[in-house]
Amino acid sequence: MKIKDAVNMIRWEYREKIDDYVIIIIDRLTENGLKEISFSELDAVDNNYLYLKSEENTVIPLHRVLMIKRKSDNALIWKR
């Protein structure tokens, strides 16, 4: 399954529990090199980028996405 398909599946099929899902990305500015982004922060996804709801209009390239997890049981939904 492609990243875009996994993101869209969660956004539309599990929208009632969207806060339970996070996207883990590579972020060189953090101490451990990883950053969690809640699905509630996500505005859109296309074939190349994640677009976040923010005043800065943050755009994250999909090649930085490492995995998608469910927080409640720490289940791995998608992994590179």
Swiss-Prot record:
Q: Which InterPro entries match?
A: MJ1316 (IPR040459), UPF0248 (IPR007547)
Please give the Pfam families that the UniProt record associates with this protein.
MJ1316 (PF04457)
HAMAP family per the UniProt record, alphabetical? UPF0248 (MF_01245)
Family stated for the protein in its record: Belongs to the UPF0248 family.
Protein name listed in UniProt: UPF0248 protein LS215_2790
